[in-house]
Amino acid sequence: MEQNEVKKLLHHRDPYLMVDRVIEISPEYIHSQKDMSSHVITGGHFPGAPIVPGAMLQEMCTQAAGVMISKFHAPVEDYDSEKTKGYALGVLSEIKNAKFVGMTRPDQVIDIKVKLENKQRSRFDFTAVVFQDGESRAAISFQLVNIPSDLL
């Protein structure tokens, strides 16, 4: 799935859209990728020795999970980010645990692998691992919720 299809499932837009492509997706799993080489944030974090901020790695995981929710777990049929039908999908409600290992550099593709661990009504618990060059860079567990858009 390329980014134009991702945009139908997520409200995020550049420069904050953190899913460039989806490699694999199912109702319980998503593998997405992000290329940060020319991203605006990398020039200032840190000049001369750029690294991708941990908060951005978390956001990549959250957005990948949001794609999965929009595609397979939306409370309305044919969800489209332009026609939300009254819902905000995949709103971050909790970061349960986050561990960052090593430095994630913006000059290589970042792989994000997210697994749906539990679903109860409109609450979704996920675990995610962020990889770069085949090595784990972060392990994150978090919760997203679907809410009526009038609560935003």
Model-derived segments and their meaning:
Residues 13, 33-39, 94-95, 105-113:
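Terminal leader/tail segments of proteins
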Residues 66-111:
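Hydrophobic beta-strand-centered segment that forms part of the acyl-chain substrate-binding groove
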Residues 52, 57-71:
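Active-site- and interface-proximal helix/loop "cap" or "latch" segments in soluble metabolic
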Residues 7, 48-49, 99-102:
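Beta-strand-rich interaction surfaces with strong enrichment in secreted/lumenal proteins
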Residues 11-52, 56-57:
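Catalytic strand-loop segment that frames the active site of acyl-thioester-processing enzymes
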Residues 27-28, 70, 101-152:
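HotDog/MaoC-like acyl-thioester-processing domains
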Residues 1-6, 110-111:
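Short Pro/Gly-enriched beta-strand edge/turn motifs at strand-loop
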